[in-house]
Amino acid sequence: MPIIHTFGFGGSTGAELCLVSPIYTSGAVWFVSSVGGTDAAAPAGKSREAPLASLAQAQTNAAAGDVIVILVNHTESLGTKLTLSKAGLVILGEGMGTSRPTFNRTADVNLFDVTGAGIRLENVRFATDSAAGYTADRVLISAATCIVRGCYFASGVNDSVSPALAVASGVANLTIDGATYFVSSGTSRTVTGFRGLALNGTATDLELHDVIFEGGTYGWLSHALNGAGAVTRLRAKDVDLLNGSDVVLA
């Protein structure tokens, strides 16, 4: 039985599903904000007025197919890997520009490790690393049928070793769309973002729609999009390669 949210989720900017009303969901809706939120076990976090403080807690509380709404100006720094394992989880960010939910890592771990099939990330900002030399893929997708929509991946002087977004070998039906940005901002040709999007092996049914690779002044240390294995059925439309951004596919 669908749950009817007559007035929507209550947002005014951000992911499209945060703005419409009424809206129907098949699972619970959880709210997250580092501004006044408090982490606690379920059922905490089901009220916009009393959100959880972290996405990590929301992932723990949620079940497969639930929705997590991250409120405007949320920030979260992670020193351990956050595994997103609940199949069909929908993660929606409110806000625009730098006010959208922002995540950064403080250790050499995957910031997000997406292992649940059908997970959707929308309108989330991934900041540059807090220190140089991290080798782990910043965001790693290793499950099928995921969607990355309207997200922003920043790479800078501390990001010369690992990609902003990586796709594990064998992943199928990944869609990246909705004005998703990969941006490099370095200080020299050798101190700049490593890669925006990395395909770590083979991929099947990869769709890129309205994706922007921005190399800034010094471009990318490797390639804006690098594919290490064969891609079966790549569909790309309105992909912009700007300022030294290039693509290499096996």
Where are the regions that the model predicts?
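Glycine-rich repeat segments that build the extracellular carbohydrate-interaction surface of secreted
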Residues: 30-36, 53-77, 89-96
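Flexible, charged surface loops at secondary-structure boundaries
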Residues: 23-27, 60-64, 84-85, 113-115, ...
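Interface-prone segments of viral and bacterial extracellular assemblies
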Residues: 1, 26-28, 85-91, 173, ...
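Right-handed parallel beta-helix/beta-spiral solenoid domain characteristic of secreted/periplasmic
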Residues: 77, 88-139, 155-157, 184-186
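Right-handed parallel beta-helix
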Residues: 92-94, 117-128, 144-156, 170-187, ...
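Right-handed parallel beta-helix/beta-solenoid
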Residues: 1-57, 240
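Beta-strand-rich, repetitive solenoid scaffolds
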Residues: 5-8, 52-53, 61, 92-93, ...
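Glycine-rich beta-solenoid repeat tracts in large extracellular/virion proteins
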Residues: 80-84, 107-115, 132-142, 159-170, ...
